[in-house]
């Protein structure tokens, strides 16, 4: 969803943390989830939040077309793209909505996503993602963190779906259907 990048980024950064150089991490030196392996020309250790945000928007959010995905689905796809690559994230999204999994979020994928139940899409994507992570040789080392992350992304994503589906009654409609005397009472209320 167009207005969700900042919220989704905050969730990503909460999971990615700051600077680390874990010799067991295939990404090697990372900061805010941006790895030296993927960005060899970046000054990883001194990376700013603004620079990380620009990279995340350009290379991950835009790749999964986050602005065009429903609330919650955008977070699930974005987090998957950051953690496992945009192509793999796109394939999980595509399988969740039963379209050809070619790894590119295009018009067919977007049309299917718009027709699908967003909560079901999130759950299917994250179940598929967790199963894939379970098969990695690094699963035993990172399973607690990965499982926690997916559980938290699921919870936040489903909350975003619910919040987006709550109808907001226009004020004019409320005034028109207000109980007798309520409008006059509000007009006389102090303040």
Mark where each language-model region is.
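Cell-wall polysaccharide-cleaving catalytic domain and substrate-binding groove, primarily
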Residues: 1-191
């Amino acid at each position: 969803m167009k207005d969700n990048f900042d919220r989704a980024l905050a969730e990503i950064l909460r999971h990615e943390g700051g600077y680390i150089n874990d010799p067991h991490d295939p990404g090697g030196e990372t900061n805010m989830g941006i790895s030296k392996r993927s960005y060899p020309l970046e000054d990883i250790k001194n990376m700013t939040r603004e620079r990380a945000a620009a990279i995340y928007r350009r290379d991950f959010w835009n790749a999964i077309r986050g602005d065009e995905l429903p609330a919650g689905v955008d977070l699930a796809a974005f987090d998957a793209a950051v953690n496992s690559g945009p192509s793999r994230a796109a394939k999980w999204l595509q399988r969740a909505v039963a379209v050809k999994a070619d790894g590119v979020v295009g018009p067919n994928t977007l049309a299917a996503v718009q027709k699908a139940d967003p909560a079901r899409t999130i759950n299917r994507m994250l179940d598929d993602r967790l199963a894939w992570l379970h098969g990695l040789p690094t699963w035993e080392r990172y399973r607690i963190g990965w499982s926690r992350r997916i559980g938290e992304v699921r919870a936040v994503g489903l909350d975003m779906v619910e919040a987006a589906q709550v109808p907001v009654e226009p004020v004019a409609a409320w005034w028109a259907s207000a109980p007798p005397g309520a409008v006059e009472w509000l007009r006389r209320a102090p303040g």
